């Protein structure tokens, strides 16, 4: 995961409250979007 995605992930959902499946989905969307 790139630094940009790492910085943007917390803006979508707090990592502590983010289920793994949701985290993977967001990461996939961001990676595909970039």
Curated annotation (Swiss-Prot):
- Cross-link Cyclopeptide (Leu-Pro) residue location(s): 11-20
State whether keyword Thylakoid applies: no
Query: From the record, what ranges are coiled-coil?
Result: none
A GO MF annotation of the entry reads: toxin activity
Entry keywords, A to Z: Toxin
Cystine residue pairs:
none
Prosegment residue ranges? 1-10, 21-34
**Modification after translation:** Processed by the macrocyclase-peptidase enzyme POPB to yield a toxic cyclic decapeptide. POPB first removes 10 residues from the N-terminus. Conformational trapping of the remaining peptide forces the enzyme to release this intermediate rather than proceed to macrocyclization. The enzyme rebinds the remaining peptide in a different conformation and catalyzes macrocyclization of the N-terminal 10 residues.
InterPro entries (alphabetical): Amanitin/phalloidin
Q: Record's superkingdom?
A: Eukaryota
The family line of this record is:
Belongs to the MSDIN fungal toxin family.
| Function text | Probable toxin that belongs to the MSDIN-like toxin family responsible for a large number of food poisoning cases and deaths.
Q: What is this protein called?
A: MSDIN-like toxin proprotein 4
């Amino acid at each position: 995961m790139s630094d940009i995605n790492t910085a943007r992930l917390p803006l979508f959902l707090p990592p502590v409250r983010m289920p793994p499946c949701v985290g993977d989905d967001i990461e996939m969307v961001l990676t595909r979007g970039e």
